């Protein structure tokens, strides 16, 4: 009888998993940068805390300011220090021009540089235009927008001498699209976007980048107080069918702070699960 046919060749090995083709390099470029957080909650909770912890995990030293460094701020300071980086909180009124100049110079003396500025403050005093008081308007603009100007103004000469720096303004999707009942908040966050774009044009030739992040519905202590029904209605409007996390925003902030975004400036990145396109 004829000999049996040779066995078929073995199948080719399967391709490597998809993620291996696009593995992200480590963000070693944050070490040993100094990051300054200007925030209504310092880096004590929510998005600010998530960004501070993410930056610290990548090796960045952390300085943050708040009107008062309370127990939350002190606890976060300890949590960041446990990651092996230098961290310090500073009590300062961000809406006061002179106070801001002093605290930024003090941070420069203590840390040696200010490489990344995160303007993360945000308060709300919502109301329809017909019922909104002047005090409601002024408070939101002062905390959300004027204090960002104060800190950028104070950090600019430091970053110019360094010939490098990354400024990250925390805006909001309502600063892009508006929202009824939030004209003061929307205006302040739209101002943060315009401020970032203008700074990017002014200081780009000095090696300084400026960008804005516009978060959508992010699950924080504030939004956790909403009813399940309200949160479900929000989720229906989001293509990814879920709210975002502070860590989602922190990942984008880390990208903008690092050299992975060295050719990215004057941009607004919406972190909203596709809610606004």
Question: What function would you assign to each model-found segment?
Answer:
Residues 58-75:
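Conserved glycine-rich Rossmann-like NAD(P)H-binding loop of the short-chain dehydrogenase/reductase
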Residues 157, 201-205, 262:
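Alpha-helical segment proximal to the catalytic Tyr-Lys
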Residues 152, 188, 196:
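Active-site helix of classical SDR
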């Amino acid at each position: 009888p004829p000999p049996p046919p040779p066995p078929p060749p073995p199948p080719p090995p399967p391709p490597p998993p998809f993620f291996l083709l696009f593995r992200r390099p480590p963000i070693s470029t944050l070490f040993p940068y100094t990051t300054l957080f200007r925030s209504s909650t310092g880096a004590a909770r929510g998005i600010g805390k998530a960004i501070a912890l993410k930056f610290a995990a990548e090796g960045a030293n952390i300085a943050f300011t708040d009107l008062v460094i309370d127990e939350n701020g002190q606890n976060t300071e300890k949590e960041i220090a446990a990651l092996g980086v230098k961290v310090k909180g500073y009590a300062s009124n961000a809406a006061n021009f002179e106070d801001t100049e002093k605290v930024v110079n003090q941070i420069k003396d203590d840390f040696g540089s200010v490489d990344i500025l995160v303007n993360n403050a945000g308060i709300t005093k919502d109301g329809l235009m017909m019922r909104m008081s002047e005090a409601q308007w002024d408070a939101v603009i002062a905390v959300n927008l004027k204090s960002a100007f104060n800190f950028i103004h104070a950090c600019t000469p430091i970053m110019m001498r360094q010939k490098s720096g990354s400024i990250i303004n925390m805006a909001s999707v309502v600063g892009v699209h508006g929202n009824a009942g939030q004209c003061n908040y929307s205006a302040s966050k739209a101002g943060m976007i315009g401020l970032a774009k203008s700074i990017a044009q002014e200081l780009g030739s000095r090696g300084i980048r400026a960008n804005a992040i516009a978060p959508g519905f992010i699950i924080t202590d504030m939004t956790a107080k909403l009813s399940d029904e309200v949160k479900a209605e929000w989720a229906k409007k989001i293509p990814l069918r879920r709210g975002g996390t502070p860590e989602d925003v922190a990942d984008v902030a880390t990208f903008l702070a690092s050299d992975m975004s060295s050719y990215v400036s004057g941009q607004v990145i919406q972190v909203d699960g596709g809610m606004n396109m």
